C-alpha cells in the first residue's frame, strides 16, 4: 500500500513544492520559542520537573533500602557479622523479601495504572500514584515501638514498602506516556531521557542524605556507642522523600489531558464506523489518484517505513491531518488484543518486555545488594558500626557519582544522535563484558579492580539499556495502547528485579559471587538478541503509523531497499 503525504514548503502559488522533513519543520518552529535550561522551553522544563521529580522519588525510595539494610541488621538482628552457625543474623530470605517489596508492588502499579491510563485517560490517573506514595511513606516511618519482634518489624516494613511500590510503579507508564505525547518528535528522546535521568539524582541523594544523617548522629553513634539512635536515621532516610512528593502532587492533579490521547479516543464515543468510510477524501486529488504529480515528488514506499524514518518523516497537508485524527481505535481490551494480535506489533512488545526483564535481573541484583557486594570486596569494612555504615554510604556515593549519574547524562546528550537501538546494544555488550571479567577473575582481581568493573558496568548500564528500555515502550507504541504496553514491559522488568532480590543472597551462598556474575553476563548478552526485534524509534511517530495502518486495514508492510536498513531500523522477523 503506497501513501503520498507531504508538507509543502515555500509560497503556495509556486509551481513546485518540496517535501520537508518533520524534524526540520519542528526545528524551525522551535527557533521562535524561548529557550530555558538545556535548550528546553518553559513548558518542557515544567514537564521535566513534574515527571522527573517522580523518578527522583522512584530511585530514592527503591534504592534507599540498600543503605537502610545494614542499619536494620545492627538494630534488629544483632549486627552483620556471621554467627556461630556460619550464617548472618539477618536471614537472607527475609532480607531479600524486604528488598523486593517495592518491586513486587511495582508490578501491580504498572499494570493497573497503565491500563487505567489508556482506559480513563492520563488526566484522570496522573497524581493518584503520588497520593499512594505519600500515604505509604507516612505509614512506613510510623512503625510503632510496641512491635518488638524483629520479624514483625520487617513485615511492617514489607507491607508499606509494597504499597509504596504500587504508587512508584504507577508513575512509570503514566510519566512515560505523558512525556512522549507532549514532546516534539525531534526532542522526544532527549526529554524522556532527561526525566528518567532524575533516577540518578535520586540514588545520589540517597547516599548524600545517609552521609549527612550519619554525620549528624556521629557523637552518639561513634563516640558513645548509642546505636539505638539509628532508629531516627532510617526513619529520616525514608521520610525525607515526602518533601518532593508533596511538592509535585497538586500540579500533577491539575495537569490537562494530552492532545494525542484525545485524538486516539475519537472512536471511543460509540461511533464505531469503519475508518475508511468515516473519512472524506473525495476532494483530495492525491488520495483519489496517487500517481498525480502536479509538481510534487512521489514517495513510493510503505506507510510504516515512510513514517518511521527519522530523516524523511513528513507532515501531511492540514486537511489530511484533520481527517487522520479521526482514524483511531478506542483504548479497550478488545482494541489492545486486536493490535497485538499482529506479529509486527507483538514482536515489539516481546522485545521491550524481555529486554527489560533481562536487564533488571542484573541491574537490581547489583543495586539492591550493593552494600553486600561492597562488603564482600572489602570496601565497606570499619573499626566500629558507625565507620562501617559511613564507609558503605561513601562507597555507594562513589559508584553513583562515577558511574550511575554520568551514564544517564551521556544518554541525554547522545540519544538523538546515536539512536535508541545503538545505545541499547552497546550498553548490553559492554556491561556484559564487565560482568564476564568479574566472573572469570573474581578471586584474582584486587578490591580496586572489582570496584572499577562495577563502576564501568553502572556507567554503560545507565548509558544504555536501563534508559532505553524505559524510552522504547514510550515511543514504539501508539497512544491508544501506550500506557498498557509500557506497564506490561515495566512489570515484566520488575519480575526480573524480584528474582534478583529474592535469589541473589541464596545463589551467592551456594555457587559464589563469581558464578552469579556469569548469570548477569548471560542476561546482558541475551538482551542483545531481543533488542534485534525492535525498530529504531528515533524520529518515529507511532501514532501516525497507527492511523495509516487503520486507514489501509493494517496492511502497512515494511519495505526497504537496504537489507541492513531493513533489519536494523525495523527489527528482525
From Swiss-Prot:
InterPro entries listed in its UniProt record: MFS_dom, MFS_sugar_transport-like, MFS_trans_sf, Phos_permease, Sugar_transporter_CS
Keyword Secreted attached: no
UniProt cross-references to CDD domains, sorted A to Z: MFS_PhT (cd17364)
Entry coiled-coil feature ranges: none
Superkingdom per UniProt: Eukaryota
Role description: High-affinity transporter for external inorganic phosphate.
Protein name: Putative inorganic phosphate transporter C1683.01
